[in-house]
Protein backbone atom coordinates (compact mmCIF):
# COMPACT_ATOMS: atom_id res chain seq x y z
CA UNK A 1 0.00 0.00 0.00
CA UNK A 2 1.23 3.50 -0.78
CA UNK A 3 1.62 6.22 1.82
CA UNK A 4 1.41 10.00 2.04
CA UNK A 5 2.54 12.42 4.70
CA UNK A 6 0.22 15.02 6.15
CA UNK A 7 2.12 18.27 5.39
CA UNK A 8 2.75 18.93 9.09
CA UNK A 9 4.00 15.38 9.59
CA UNK A 10 6.39 15.81 6.65
CA UNK A 11 7.70 18.98 8.30
CA UNK A 12 8.15 17.18 11.65
CA UNK A 13 10.06 14.39 9.96
CA UNK A 14 12.33 16.81 8.08
CA UNK A 15 12.97 18.90 11.19
CA UNK A 16 13.83 15.80 13.22
CA UNK A 17 16.24 14.53 10.57
CA UNK A 18 17.89 17.97 10.55
CA UNK A 19 18.09 18.03 14.36
CA UNK A 20 19.84 14.66 14.54
CA UNK A 21 22.05 15.47 11.53
CA UNK A 22 23.31 18.60 13.26
CA UNK A 23 24.28 16.52 16.28
CA UNK A 24 25.95 13.90 14.09
CA UNK A 25 25.40 13.23 10.36
CA UNK A 26 25.35 9.47 10.96
CA UNK A 27 22.66 9.94 13.59
CA UNK A 28 20.53 11.90 11.12
CA UNK A 29 20.90 9.13 8.57
CA UNK A 30 20.06 6.50 11.20
CA UNK A 31 16.91 8.38 12.22
CA UNK A 32 15.79 8.82 8.60
CA UNK A 33 16.41 5.15 7.84
CA UNK A 34 14.59 3.97 10.95
CA UNK A 35 11.49 6.04 10.23
CA UNK A 36 11.45 4.91 6.60
CA UNK A 37 11.76 1.27 7.73
CA UNK A 38 8.87 1.70 10.18
CA UNK A 39 6.73 3.25 7.44
CA UNK A 40 7.61 0.36 5.12
CA UNK A 41 6.44 -2.11 7.79
CA UNK A 42 3.24 -0.11 8.24
CA UNK A 43 2.50 -0.26 4.50
CA UNK A 44 3.00 -4.04 4.46
CA UNK A 45 0.70 -4.75 7.42
CA UNK A 46 -1.16 -1.58 8.43
CA UNK A 47 -3.68 -3.18 10.81
CA UNK A 48 -1.12 -4.83 13.10
CA UNK A 49 -0.32 -1.72 15.15
CA UNK A 50 -2.19 -0.38 18.16
CA UNK A 51 -5.23 1.83 17.63
CA UNK A 52 -4.85 4.82 19.93
CA UNK A 53 -7.88 6.90 18.98
CA UNK A 54 -10.72 6.49 16.50
CA UNK A 55 -9.00 5.18 13.36
CA UNK A 56 -5.53 6.39 14.32
CA UNK A 57 -2.81 3.81 14.85
CA UNK A 58 0.69 4.14 16.26
CA UNK A 59 3.93 2.33 15.53
CA UNK A 60 6.89 3.05 17.80
CA UNK A 61 10.46 3.32 16.55
CA UNK A 62 13.02 1.15 18.31
CA UNK A 63 16.07 3.37 18.57
CA UNK A 64 14.51 6.82 18.86
CA UNK A 65 11.73 8.13 21.14
CA UNK A 66 9.19 8.57 18.34
CA UNK A 67 5.85 7.21 17.33
CA UNK A 68 4.53 7.20 13.78
CA UNK A 69 0.80 7.98 13.86
CA UNK A 70 -1.29 7.07 10.85
CA UNK A 71 -4.70 6.27 9.44
CA UNK A 72 -5.63 3.72 6.83
CA UNK A 73 -7.38 5.49 3.98
CA UNK A 74 -9.07 3.83 1.02
CA UNK A 75 -6.00 3.71 -1.25
CA UNK A 76 -3.10 4.72 0.98
CA UNK A 77 -1.70 5.16 4.47
CA UNK A 78 -1.81 8.74 5.76
CA UNK A 79 1.07 9.57 8.12
CA UNK A 80 -0.44 12.08 10.56
CA UNK A 81 2.55 12.66 12.82
CA UNK A 82 6.17 11.78 13.43
CA UNK A 83 5.80 12.43 17.13
CA UNK A 84 8.55 12.77 19.70
CA UNK A 85 7.35 11.30 22.98
CA UNK A 86 8.15 14.49 24.90
CA UNK A 87 5.40 16.37 23.04
CA UNK A 88 1.84 16.85 24.17
CA UNK A 89 0.20 13.60 23.06
CA UNK A 90 -2.79 15.41 21.57
CA UNK A 91 -1.05 18.10 19.49
CA UNK A 92 -1.72 16.28 16.19
CA UNK A 93 -5.46 15.65 16.63
CA UNK A 94 -6.54 18.60 14.49
CA UNK A 95 -4.97 16.81 11.53
CA UNK A 96 -7.69 14.17 11.57
CA UNK A 97 -10.45 16.71 11.00
CA UNK A 98 -8.68 18.30 8.07
CA UNK A 99 -8.46 14.98 6.26
CA UNK A 100 -11.79 13.29 7.03
Question: Where are the regions a protein language model picked out?
Answer:
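Basic/aromatic recognition patch in beta-strand/loop cores that engages polyanionic ligands
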Residues: 44-77, 82
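GIY-YIG nuclease signature motif recognition
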Residues: 9, 35, 70
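Outer-membrane beta-barrel domain signature
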Residues: 7, 39-44
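Short amphipathic alpha-helical/adjacent loop interface patches that line ligand
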Residues: 13, 17, 35, 39, ...
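Enriched for short, Lys/Arg-rich terminal
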Residues: 71-100
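Residues that form or immediately flank small-molecule/cofactor binding pockets and catalytic motifs
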Residues: 8, 64, 84-87
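Arg/Lys-rich, positively charged N-terminal/basic patches that mediate binding to nucleic acids
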Residues: 1-32
